[in-house]
């Protein structure tokens, strides 16, 4: 396990260096480690927690969650086996990036082929299971589109709206769709942390509908405003939204949301605002 971890750390370091050195390519799939670790620490995953990243990239959130569980708890043999094989789930649309994710997890002694969905569009289908925790940084880019070939043989991009009966609004906005998808992935009392750009906070129409329903159906307790430039794409204004899925009997008028602007990402962010999950140890089939 230790030897695997050393090789894994070297491999992850190479991924991070490539993300820093490349304007396109790995950088679009790599979330800065300091941000990942801060989010994971305040979320406080426990042994037995079923965790999914529906836009996994190279697997940084899942690796960090596993690392924090191993560091914070003394696990017995069954708990270690569960963490290695049943606790972490990844979905990644880009097949080559999914292979990087699989290698990253396997070099750290984590995951298996059943837990990594490669080349799958998270947004295309309603979830077949629910999870205790969702940690994710969906790819930035406002609109979803598909490339088609027209009669002249030219490639044309067309806007793609996601039609799902578990979504509150139909829209081509990828971030709004990911936000709705994350809510659908959660068990009752499950918890989520999702990185989102500013357009999700202020867009009208479908954006307003999604925000109202999220505030009504979930406990949206914390919004962390990130400093500009934390991502490799310059000028991107981003936020981390923390929320818990409430039982239907507890839906009510929205409670106040705690908001902060962080000049420096540290592991102490909002630790008093987050509550441990009361959900069971594994994904629930639906």
Description of each model-found segment:
Residues 23, 53-56, 186, 231:
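Short glycine- and Lys/Arg-enriched binding-loop motifs that mark or flank ligand-binding interfaces
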Residues 25-136, 140-145, 150-154, 176, ...:
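Conserved S-adenosyl-L-methionine
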Residues 6, 31, 96, 174, ...:
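A generic structural signal for residues located within well-ordered alpha-helices
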Residues 18, 69, 83-85, 280-284:
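Charged, low-complexity, helix-prone segments enriched in Lys/Glu/Asp/Gln
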Residues 125-286:
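A conserved structural/catalytic subdomain of Rossmann-like adenosyl-cofactor enzymes
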Residues 1-47, 113-122, 225-229, 250-255, ...:
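Non-catalytic, mostly N-terminal accessory regions of nucleic-acid modification and defense proteins
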């Amino acid at each position: 396990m230790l030897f695997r971890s050393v090789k894994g750390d070297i491999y992850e370091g190479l991924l991070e260096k490539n993300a820093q050195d490349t304007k396109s390519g790995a950088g679009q799939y790599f979330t800065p480690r300091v941000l990942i670790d801060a989010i994971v620490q305040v979320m406080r995953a426990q042994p037995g927690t079923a965790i999914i990243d529906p836009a996994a990239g190279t697997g940084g959130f899942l690796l960090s969650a596993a690392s924090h569980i191993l560091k914070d708890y003394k696990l017995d043999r069954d708990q270690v086996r569960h963490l290695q094989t049943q606790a972490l789930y990844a979905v990644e649309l880009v097949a080559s990036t999914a292979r990087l994710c699989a290698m990253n997890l396997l070099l750290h002694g984590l995951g298996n082929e059943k837990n990594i969905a490669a080349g799958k569009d998270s947004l295309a289908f309603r979830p077949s299971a629910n999870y205790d925790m969702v940690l994710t940084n969906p790819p930035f880019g406002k609109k979803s589109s598909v490339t088609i070939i027209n009669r002249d043989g030219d490639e044309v991009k067309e806007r793609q709206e996601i039609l799902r009966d578990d979504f509150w609004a139909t829209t081509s906005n990828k971030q709004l769709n990911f936000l709705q998808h994350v809510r659908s992935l959660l068990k009752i009392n499950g918890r989520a942390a999702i990185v989102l750009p500013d357009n999700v906070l202020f867009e009208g129409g479908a954006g307003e509908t999604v925000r109202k329903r999220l505030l009504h159906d979930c406990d949206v307790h914390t919004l962390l405003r990130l400093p500009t430039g934390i991502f490799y794409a310059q000028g991107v204004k981003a936020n981390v939204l923390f929320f818990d899925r409430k039982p239907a009997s507890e839906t009510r008028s929205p409670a106040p949301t705690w908001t902060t602007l962080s000049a420096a990402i540290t592991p102490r962010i909002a630790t008093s605002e987050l509550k441990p999950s009361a959900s069971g140890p594994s994904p629930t089939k639906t």
